[in-house]
C-alpha cells in the first residue's frame, strides 16, 4: 500500500512479437490487490478529491509533459511490445498525449471548483425561499479500466485522464 511491490514468483515472459526475445517478466503473485485498491480508495481518492479541477488538470499537464519528454523512447517500446511501425506508434503515443492535454485544458477551464453545478436553481416552493440545485460530485471508489492491446497509450489515457480529472484514482 503506497509502494511498488514486485511479484513473488518468476512470472510470465513478455516477448517481442517480431523476434520472440524476452523483454521482461510480469507477475502478480504475492501482490495484495485488495490492499492496493484500499489504498487507492482510502488515500488516493480523498487526496485527488481535495484538489480542484484546475489542480487535477495541472497534474494531468505534468503527465503529458513527461510523456512528451520521453516520446522517442515510447516508439522503441511500442515496436518491441506490439511490433508497431513508426506510424502506428505515433497514432497511439501522440493520441494518448493529445487526449491528456485535451482533458488538462478542459479541467483548467473548470477552475477552482471541486464539484459542478448542473443546471439552474429549481424552485421548490411558491416563492424563492426554498430552492435546490443539482451538483455533480466525484464518485468514490477506484476506476478499474480494461484496455485493448492495439492502442495501449491512447486507450489507457482516454480512460485514466477522465477518471483522474474527476477525482477517481
Question: Where are these predicted regions, by residue range?
Answer:
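N-terminal Rossmann-like NAD(P)+-binding subdomain of aldehyde/semialdehyde dehydrogenases
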Residues: 1-126
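Conserved small-residue-rich beta-alpha loop and adjacent elements
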Residues: 117-169
Amino acid at each position: 500500500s503506497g509502494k511498488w511491490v514486485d511479484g513473488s514468483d518468476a512470472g510470465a515472459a513478455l516477448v517481442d512479437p517480431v523476434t520472440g526475445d524476452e523483454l521482461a517478466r510480469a507477475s502478480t503473485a504475492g501482490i495484495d490487490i485488495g490492499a492496493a485498491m484500499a489504498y487507492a480508495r482510502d488515500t488516493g481518492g480523498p487526496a485527488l478529491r481535495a484538489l480542484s479541477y484546475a489542480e487535477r488538470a495541472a497534474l494531468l499537464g505534468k503527465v503529458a509533459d513527461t510523456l512528451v519528454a520521453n516520446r522517442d523512447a515510447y516508439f522503441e517500446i511500442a515496436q518491441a511490445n506490439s511490433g508497431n511501425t513508426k506510424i502506428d506508434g505515433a497514432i497511439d503515443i501522440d493520441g494518448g498525449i493529445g487526449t491528456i492535454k485535451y482533458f488538462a485544458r478542459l479541467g483548467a477551464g473548470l477552475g477552482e471548483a471541486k464539484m459542478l453545478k448542473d443546471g439552474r436553481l429549481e424552485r421548490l416552493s411558491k416563492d424563492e425561499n426554498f430552492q435546490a440545485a443539482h451538483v455533480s460530485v466525484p464518485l468514490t471508489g477506484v476506476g478499474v479500466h480494461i484496455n485493448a492491446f492495439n492502442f495501449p497509450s491512447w486507450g489507457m489515457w482516454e480512460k485514466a485522464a477522465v477518471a483522474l480529472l474527476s477525482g477517481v484514482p
